[in-house]
Amino acid sequence: MQHLVLIGFMGSGKSSLAQELGLALKLEVLDTDMIISERVGLSVREIFEELGEDNFRMFEKNLIDELKTLKTPHVISTGGGIVMHDNLKGLGTTFYLKMDFETLIKRLNQKEREKRPLLNDLTQAKELFEKRQALYEKNASFIIDARGGLNNSLKQVLQFIA
């Protein structure tokens, strides 16, 4: 078994699904944003504000290469922009948690939106969402309809890997 890599826009449920998959499959769960945040000693928002998005993307790209060297399979929850890296290919089996923009925004309360620097301006966020759609689909081994909630997404992933 390869790594199971969850991709999708901010708020699509990657972190929650990763935890459930980890429990169901008895695999360790890794969260790329959390790993970067712990290593740098700043939240993702603080990294963007203090070090810039380019530095965050560099940390992300380097982490992908590092994760490729792990010998045992993991469930990996990724940041929404990870699909911008050409080295994502080969990390594992990727599952795109697909959801429309309006549903994503409804799922995130104000506090959650404040943690995500790229959601400050909803018009810009929607443009980013639309731009990334093709990248998510291009990088996906499988597309998960994430609108049906966590349990539904979990069932879909488990069916694909059965």
Swiss-Prot record:
The keyword Zinc-finger does not apply. It is found in: Cytoplasm. It catalyses: shikimate + ATP = 3-phosphoshikimate + ADP + H(+). Keywords: Amino-acid biosynthesis, Aromatic amino acid biosynthesis, ATP-binding, Cytoplasm, Kinase, Magnesium, Metal-binding, Nucleotide-binding, Transferase. PROSITE patterns: SHIKIMATE_KINASE. Binds 1 Mg(2+) ion per subunit. It holds the Pfam family SKI. GO terms for biological process: amino acid biosynthetic process; aromatic amino acid family biosynthetic process; chorismate biosynthetic process. Its cofactor is Mg(2+). Its EC number is 2.7.1.71. InterPro entries: P-loop_NTPase, Shikimate/glucono_kinase, Shikimate_kinase/TSH1, Shikimate_kinase_CS. One of its GO terms (cellular component) is cytosol. Gene3D superfamilies: P-loop containing nucleotide triphosphate hydrolases. Catalyzes the specific phosphorylation of the 3-hydroxyl group of shikimic acid using ATP as a cosubstrate. Belongs to the shikimate kinase family. This is Shikimate kinase. It comes from Helicobacter pylori (strain P12).
